[in-house]
Protein backbone atom coordinates (compact mmCIF):
# COMPACT_ATOMS: atom_id res chain seq x y z
CA UNK A 1 0.00 0.00 0.00
CA UNK A 2 2.81 2.39 0.89
CA UNK A 3 4.67 1.56 -2.33
CA UNK A 4 1.68 2.48 -4.48
CA UNK A 5 1.05 5.71 -2.59
CA UNK A 6 4.74 6.63 -2.86
CA UNK A 7 4.70 6.01 -6.62
CA UNK A 8 1.61 8.19 -6.98
CA UNK A 9 3.27 10.92 -4.91
CA UNK A 10 6.39 10.81 -7.11
CA UNK A 11 4.31 10.90 -10.30
CA UNK A 12 2.25 13.93 -9.27
CA UNK A 13 4.82 16.44 -10.55
CA UNK A 14 4.97 14.67 -13.94
CA UNK A 15 1.18 14.75 -14.13
CA UNK A 16 1.12 18.47 -13.38
CA UNK A 17 3.79 19.09 -16.05
CA UNK A 18 1.74 17.17 -18.61
CA UNK A 19 -1.36 19.21 -17.77
CA UNK A 20 0.61 22.46 -18.12
CA UNK A 21 1.92 21.29 -21.49
CA UNK A 22 -1.56 20.37 -22.65
CA UNK A 23 -2.80 23.85 -21.78
CA UNK A 24 0.02 25.46 -23.79
CA UNK A 25 -1.12 26.86 -27.15
CA UNK A 26 1.31 24.78 -29.24
CA UNK A 27 0.32 21.40 -27.77
CA UNK A 28 -3.34 21.93 -26.99
CA UNK A 29 -4.16 24.16 -29.96
CA UNK A 30 -6.46 21.61 -31.57
CA UNK A 31 -8.54 21.30 -28.40
CA UNK A 32 -7.71 17.61 -28.17
CA UNK A 33 -6.32 15.92 -25.07
CA UNK A 34 -4.80 13.08 -27.08
CA UNK A 35 -1.20 14.31 -26.81
CA UNK A 36 -1.43 14.70 -23.04
CA UNK A 37 -3.05 11.28 -22.66
CA UNK A 38 -0.27 9.70 -24.73
CA UNK A 39 2.34 11.45 -22.58
CA UNK A 40 0.59 10.17 -19.44
CA UNK A 41 0.54 6.65 -20.89
CA UNK A 42 4.23 6.85 -21.83
CA UNK A 43 5.68 8.58 -18.77
CA UNK A 44 3.42 8.05 -15.78
CA UNK A 45 1.75 4.66 -16.24
CA UNK A 46 5.01 2.65 -16.63
CA UNK A 47 6.46 4.21 -13.46
CA UNK A 48 3.22 3.75 -11.56
CA UNK A 49 2.66 0.12 -12.55
CA UNK A 50 6.27 -1.03 -12.72
CA UNK A 51 6.44 -4.74 -11.84
CA UNK A 52 2.67 -4.88 -11.22
CA UNK A 53 2.57 -8.46 -12.49
CA UNK A 54 4.16 -9.51 -9.20
CA UNK A 55 1.64 -7.69 -6.99
CA UNK A 56 0.02 -10.69 -5.34
CA UNK A 57 -2.99 -9.92 -3.17
CA UNK A 58 -3.47 -6.33 -4.31
CA UNK A 59 -6.51 -4.96 -2.51
CA UNK A 60 -9.58 -3.28 -3.90
CA UNK A 61 -8.55 -0.13 -2.04
CA UNK A 62 -5.17 -0.05 -3.76
CA UNK A 63 -6.77 -0.51 -7.18
CA UNK A 64 -9.24 2.26 -6.35
CA UNK A 65 -6.35 4.55 -5.33
CA UNK A 66 -4.64 3.94 -8.68
CA UNK A 67 -7.89 4.48 -10.59
CA UNK A 68 -8.59 7.68 -8.66
CA UNK A 69 -5.13 8.95 -9.57
CA UNK A 70 -5.84 8.36 -13.27
CA UNK A 71 -9.34 9.85 -13.01
CA UNK A 72 -8.00 12.93 -11.24
CA UNK A 73 -5.51 13.44 -14.09
CA UNK A 74 -8.29 13.21 -16.66
CA UNK A 75 -10.53 15.64 -14.78
CA UNK A 76 -7.72 18.19 -14.47
CA UNK A 77 -6.70 17.71 -18.09
CA UNK A 78 -10.20 18.17 -19.47
CA UNK A 79 -11.21 20.78 -16.87
CA UNK A 80 -14.17 18.67 -15.77
CA UNK A 81 -16.07 18.98 -12.50
CA UNK A 82 -15.90 16.16 -9.97
CA UNK A 83 -19.60 15.53 -10.66
CA UNK A 84 -18.77 14.18 -14.15
CA UNK A 85 -19.80 10.50 -14.21
CA UNK A 86 -16.85 8.12 -14.26
CA UNK A 87 -18.34 6.14 -17.13
CA UNK A 88 -18.28 9.21 -19.36
CA UNK A 89 -14.77 10.09 -18.20
CA UNK A 90 -13.47 6.62 -19.07
CA UNK A 91 -15.34 6.44 -22.37
CA UNK A 92 -14.24 9.86 -23.62
CA UNK A 93 -10.59 9.39 -22.69
CA UNK A 94 -10.30 5.89 -24.13
CA UNK A 95 -7.89 5.02 -21.33
CA UNK A 96 -7.83 1.52 -19.93
CA UNK A 97 -8.89 1.13 -16.32
CA UNK A 98 -6.11 0.33 -13.85
CA UNK A 99 -7.69 -2.98 -12.81
CA UNK A 100 -7.45 -4.30 -16.37
CA UNK A 101 -3.95 -2.91 -16.97
CA UNK A 102 -2.72 -4.91 -13.97
CA UNK A 103 -4.73 -7.99 -14.96
CA UNK A 104 -3.30 -7.93 -18.51
CA UNK A 105 0.27 -7.70 -17.18
CA UNK A 106 -0.30 -10.61 -14.79
CA UNK A 107 -1.80 -12.80 -17.52
CA UNK A 108 1.01 -11.99 -19.97
CA UNK A 109 3.61 -12.71 -17.28
CA UNK A 110 2.02 -16.05 -16.37
CA UNK A 111 1.88 -17.02 -20.06
CA UNK A 112 5.58 -16.14 -20.42
CA UNK A 113 6.47 -18.29 -17.40
CA UNK A 114 4.39 -21.24 -18.59
CA UNK A 115 6.15 -21.18 -21.99
CA UNK A 116 9.47 -21.84 -20.23
CA UNK A 117 11.07 -25.26 -19.91
CA UNK A 118 9.66 -27.56 -17.21
CA UNK A 119 12.91 -27.25 -15.25
CA UNK A 120 12.39 -23.49 -14.82
CA UNK A 121 12.06 -22.70 -11.11
CA UNK A 122 9.32 -20.10 -11.63
CA UNK A 123 7.24 -22.49 -13.70
CA UNK A 124 7.70 -25.19 -11.09
CA UNK A 125 6.59 -22.76 -8.37
CA UNK A 126 3.37 -21.99 -10.31
CA UNK A 127 2.70 -25.71 -10.82
CA UNK A 128 3.36 -26.47 -7.14
CA UNK A 129 1.08 -23.60 -6.17
CA UNK A 130 -1.72 -25.28 -8.15
CA UNK A 131 -1.00 -28.69 -6.62
CA UNK A 132 -0.96 -27.29 -3.08
CA UNK A 133 -3.95 -25.03 -3.81
CA UNK A 134 -1.98 -22.04 -2.55
CA UNK A 135 -3.05 -18.50 -3.41
CA UNK A 136 -0.40 -16.86 -5.56
CA UNK A 137 0.06 -15.63 -9.12
CA UNK A 138 -1.39 -18.77 -10.70
CA UNK A 139 -4.47 -18.65 -8.48
CA UNK A 140 -5.06 -14.95 -9.22
CA UNK A 141 -4.57 -15.47 -12.95
CA UNK A 142 -7.04 -18.36 -12.99
CA UNK A 143 -9.68 -16.01 -11.57
CA UNK A 144 -8.72 -13.22 -13.98
CA UNK A 145 -8.82 -15.57 -16.98
CA UNK A 146 -12.28 -16.77 -16.00
CA UNK A 147 -13.48 -13.18 -15.56
CA UNK A 148 -12.33 -12.11 -19.03
CA UNK A 149 -13.43 -15.32 -20.74
CA UNK A 150 -10.06 -17.02 -21.28
CA UNK A 151 -9.07 -20.57 -20.41
CA UNK A 152 -6.82 -21.19 -17.41
CA UNK A 153 -3.37 -20.15 -18.69
CA UNK A 154 -1.66 -22.75 -16.56
CA UNK A 155 -3.14 -25.35 -18.93
CA UNK A 156 -3.74 -23.48 -22.20
CA UNK A 157 -0.65 -21.27 -22.42
CA UNK A 158 0.37 -22.71 -25.81
CA UNK A 159 -3.00 -22.00 -27.44
CA UNK A 160 -3.61 -18.59 -25.85
CA UNK A 161 -1.74 -15.82 -27.64
CA UNK A 162 -0.68 -12.40 -26.38
CA UNK A 163 -3.31 -10.95 -28.70
CA UNK A 164 -6.03 -13.07 -27.07
CA UNK A 165 -5.03 -11.71 -23.66
CA UNK A 166 -4.93 -8.10 -24.87
CA UNK A 167 -8.33 -8.39 -26.59
CA UNK A 168 -9.94 -10.00 -23.53
Task: Describe each model-derived feature in a short phrase.
Residues 1-56, 112, 119-120:
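Basic, alpha-helical interaction scaffolds
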Residues 19, 80-81:
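Short hydrophobic/aromatic segments of transmembrane alpha-helices and their interfaces
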Residues 41, 52, 65, 69, ...:
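Extended C-terminal regions of large enzymes
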Residues 50, 76-79:
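Amphipathic alpha-helical interaction surfaces
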Residues 55-63:
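Acidic, serine/threonine/proline-rich low-complexity intrinsically disordered regions
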Amino acid sequence: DDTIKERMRKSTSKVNDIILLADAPMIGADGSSLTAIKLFEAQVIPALLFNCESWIGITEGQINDLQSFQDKFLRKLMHLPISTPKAILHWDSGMEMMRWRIARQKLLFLRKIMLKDNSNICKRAIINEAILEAEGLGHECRGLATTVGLQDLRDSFKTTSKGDIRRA
